[in-house]
């Protein structure tokens, strides 16, 4: 292995250490999550047990982390073999109750798949990232952590994203969750909701020119983003942050952006904001780029005659609008899927989400309080120190 590759490996390992547990353990944990998500998870897929197995795994992980697990059941319709079929779905919810009573914050990802999609790209990596954020958040705010849980955080694995199923007209699991579980849980009060962070297709990075497709009229909806992407040769070298330009969304967007950029180093994946302003209608081609993920059901929530838009941001690689530079033909193992570039990208995304939760929903313990950090549960390792250690190790090597 070359010195450059050694350096990148060490930088990555140390970067992951800042997420909360030892770097090797984080890499192992992410791979372990993805190994449970390598199969197509569709109600009429080749393996009828794959979706149930993934659901059971998510529940087990939530329980191990110390989250209070709830299950929200619903029914919807799925188009299959020329007819609409009614199917049952389960949204899996893990609740970390806060003591301070502030507005709750949500992190979510779809855990099912369409029949013709890559199960790790869409959306196994998103589920794995959500699980890692949940694991590290609970460790950071647990007995050995340096934070206390002030406001509630909930982690949600959504089932049956029918908007990605060809020809299906049934409402997806995220829609039913917002209407049937979340809104009653909030006592129908927008003031009790800090927002949602949705992870949907986050692993495709491509540094090649013309690897990023932009829909017609994309430039009208997102002029600054269009200019940046075009001038950069239409490269798929960014993580897109899709949000609405409302005051309710601003704090969530700014907190995540600050945490992401603070931990991003040269060469790592940049962040591209796509802000949908209420006074600037988005054309249908561009809207179709951002309306099939779970966040959209928060934006369009309408419990009565009046629209009650809930703040939510989407983190995405833009899904099928981007060509992957690291194909992993099916069946694709978790080990083969987790290339160096994907590890870097997923680590940065997890870190940004984790520190957003800690900033918004937790409080750092004061000196002398119980809960001093142990080596296995620390999120206090500074990134400056880890990068320095990586550089020194590379030189010594």
Regions found by a protein language model. Name each.
Residues 20-55, 59, 65, 112-113, ...:
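N-terminal capping segment at the start of a domain
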Residues 365-386:
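C-terminal GPI-anchoring signal of eukaryotic secretory precursors
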Residues 5-24, 382-396:
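Cleavable N-terminal signal peptides of Sec/SRP-targeted secreted and luminal proteins
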Residues 24, 39-52, 79-83, 114-124, ...:
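Second-shell loop/turn segments in exported
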Residues 195, 202-368:
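Active-site-adjacent substrate-binding region
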Residues 114-248:
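Acidic/histidine-rich catalytic neighborhood of metal-dependent amide-processing enzymes
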């Amino acid at each position: 292995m070359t010195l450059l590759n050694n350096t990148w490996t060490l930088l990555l390992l140390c970067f992951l250490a800042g997420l909360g547990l030892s770097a090797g353990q984080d890499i192992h944990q992410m791979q372990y999550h993805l190994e449970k998500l390598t199969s197509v998870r569709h109600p009429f897929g080749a393996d009828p047990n794959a979706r149930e197995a993934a659901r059971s795994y998510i529940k087990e992980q939530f329980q191990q982390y110390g989250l209070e697990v709830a299950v929200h059941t619903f029914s919807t319709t799925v188009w299959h073999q020329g007819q609409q079929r009614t199917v049952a779905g389960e949204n899996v919810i893990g609740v970390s109750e806060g003591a301070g009573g502030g507005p709750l914050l949500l992190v979510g990802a779809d855990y099912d798949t369409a029949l013709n999609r890559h199960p790790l790209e869409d959306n196994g990596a998103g589920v794995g990232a959500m699980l890692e954020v949940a694991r590290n958040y609970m460790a950071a705010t647990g007995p050995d952590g340096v934070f206390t849980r002030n406001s509630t955080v909930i982690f949600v694995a959504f089932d049956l994203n029918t908007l990605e199923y060809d020809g299906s007209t049934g409402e997806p699991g995220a829609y039913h969750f917002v209407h049937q579980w979340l809104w009653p849980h909030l006592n129908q009060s927008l003031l009790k909701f800090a927002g949602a962070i949705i992870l949907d297709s986050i692993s495709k990075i491509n540094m090649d020119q013309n690897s990023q497709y932009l829909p017609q009229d994309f430039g009208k909806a997102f002029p600054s983003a269009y200019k940046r992407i075009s001038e950069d040769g239409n490269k798929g070298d960014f993580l897109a942050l899709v949000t609405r330009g409302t005051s309710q969304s601003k704090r969530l967007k700014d907190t995540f952006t600050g945490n992401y950029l603070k931990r991003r180093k040269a060469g790592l994946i940049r962040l591209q904001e796509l802000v949908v302003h209420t006074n600037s209608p988005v054309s249908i081609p561009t809207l179709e780029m951002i309306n099939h993920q779970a966040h959209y059901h928060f934006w369009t929530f309408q419990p009565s005659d009046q629209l009650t838009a809930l703040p939510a941001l989407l983190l995405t690689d833009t899904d099928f609008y981007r060509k992957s530079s690291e194909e992993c033909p099916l069946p694709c193992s978790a080990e083969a899927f987790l290339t160096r570039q994907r590890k870097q990208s997923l680590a940065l995304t997890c870190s940004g989400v984790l520190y957003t939760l800690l900033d918004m929903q937790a409080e750092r313990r004061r000196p002398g309080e119980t809960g001093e950090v142990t080596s296995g549960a620390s999120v206090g390792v500074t990134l400056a120190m880890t990068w320095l250690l990586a550089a020194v190790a590379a030189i010594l090597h």
